[in-house]
Amino acid sequence: GLGDVYKRQIIFLPVERFSNTEYYMSVLLNRSTGRNMIMYSTEGGMDIEEVADKTPHLIFTEEIDPKVGLQGFQCRKIAFNLGLSGTAFKEMTKFVSALYAAYDGIDAALFEINPVLKTSDDKILAVDSKVALDGNALFRHKDYAALRDKREEDPTDCLLYTSDAADDDTR
């Protein structure tokens, strides 16, 4: 849709490097509170809507106070709720912190990682992701227009978008 920008990159990694541990994680705006939140689950690699319908108790959220941003204790809480310990716990706290910093830094509307994998050597990797940029913030990021892939957009989208319209934005 309007303002969504996608860039794809395919990376092949040997399957034996991974344990069977997959997680779901996303950063998005909680429209009911007007605050960003991290939504996460131990049920990665699955359709998150199906998980929400059948086992909602397996989906957690962590709301971010815009005055102070994501705090270290929140990253640790997420790693704890995912059942991690030791090196994997530390790696997940770094991953969550970096994920939120990236989301916040590019004016994203959504960062969704599904699955997030814990490897057999306790590394945390984003395997598949979806990033949606906030269309209202594109005027601050003129360089994002080059990343736009119209093949990824919904052809039935009724909203008109042209680069001229974005250039004429007077906000």
Model-found features: residue ranges?
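Single conserved hydrophobic/aromatic residue that forms the stacking wall/gate
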Residues: 1-9, 161-171
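Phosphate-binding site of ATP-dependent enzymes
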Residues: 4-54, 95, 99-102, 107-132
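Noncatalytic linker/hinge segments flanking ATPase motor cores
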Residues: 10, 55, 65-72, 151-160
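Short capping/connector residues at structural and topological boundaries
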Residues: 28, 51-56, 64, 138, ...
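Cap/lid and interdomain-hinge subdomains that line or gate substrate/regulatory clefts
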Residues: 47-88
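Conserved active-site and cofactor/substrate-binding residues in soluble primary-metabolism enzymes
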Residues: 70-73, 87-98, 106, 111, ...
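A generic alpha-helix structural signal
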Residues: 79, 92-100, 162
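Acidic, glycine-rich loop-and-beta core segments that form the ion-binding/anion-interacting portion
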Residues: 122-163
